[in-house]
Amino acid sequence: VENSLPAAVDQQQEWKDAMTRRFHSRSVVTGEISLPAVPSLLDEYVEMCSRIFAAVGRKFNDEELAHLRTVLQNQLAEAYSISQRSNIVISYNAPVGPTLHYQVNARWFTVAEAYENWISTREPPLFGTEPDARVWALANEAADVRDHRVLDIGAGTGRNALPLARRGHPVDVVELTPKFAEIIRTQARQEGLDLRVIVRNVFETTDDLRQDYQLILLSEVVPDFRSPQQLRRLFELAAACLAPGGQLVFNTFLPRYGYEIDDAAREFGQQAYTGMFSRQELATGVEGLPLELVADDSVYEYEQANLPSGAWPPTSWYADWVSGLDVFPVAREQSPIEMRWLVFRKTR
């Protein structure tokens, strides 16, 4: 009897496990998983689905997982190629029984649509109330503001463009989002400001831009760039449109501590408004053009030190975002990336 006891206990457990599997298969399951489209994290999507499906009693075999992987791979590639504001939505349902049905679909906004959604769903001010301290300091270098023309690319709600125009600078704005453009245009018209608004992608043409700007600025715009080629096009535009001695200022995320940006970080960063470039990509982008780097500052440190009293941080999310914490949720001093203010001067 003693020798047969372990076998009897094992048999009891087998029967219990079989009953539990049947119990799980009597569940009726419906669910949806929505995640940013990051193709290089394909394994994470497969693993998440595998765990969830198994937890509701529909464990996939190797063949089923391989098929799921292929479906996810194709949808991820499509979604990410269309927009860096894209999601993968995995809808699943299981009737009574062992079968689980699923669908994988891509959903996306254009960048302009994403920001228009901000207008309808978020309380203003969307980006803060004060102009960037770095931009304001450069504008203050002007001997005569009337001759110090400014081009603000991706001006948003006009946080920089409107104060610069009030200060007396002639300002041109190129804005991709129609609702943002209308906000700026309406305010400029009401105040009688010397401010022109152009609604389009800035890289479509330079025909309607001047070639004598003293300052070209992009605040919180370059993180939406998708490739080093766009960075190169920005430098080419600046070289063509700045007057000699004029300056280009923009902020972008750059690595720290020798961090090497991989595809997963680059893709997820773009989904989190945190597109990043390497120092080498920056150097390659400006190579051969009459532009020299004259300033390179931490956005966090510069803005914290130089914004008016009470204006730091500009928004509740700003300090963490410029520190890279929307991608790497670690202590700020340990983040492998940070947003930097870069200033380039046209040499000839």
Where are these regions (language model features)?
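A short, conserved alpha-helix within the catalytic core of class I
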Residues: 225-237
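Class I (Rossmann-like) S-adenosyl-L-methionine-dependent methyltransferase catalytic domain
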Residues: 1-142, 157-163, 167, 174-191, ...
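A short acidic, Gly/Pro-enriched loop at the edge of an enzyme's catalytic core
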Residues: 207-216
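Short glycine-dipeptide loop
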Residues: 242-248
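A short beta-strand submotif of the Rossmann-like class I SAM-dependent methyltransferase core
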Residues: 218-221
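A structural alpha-helix within SAM-dependent methyltransferase catalytic domains
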Residues: 162-165, 235-239
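Conserved class I S-adenosyl-L-methionine
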Residues: 146-156
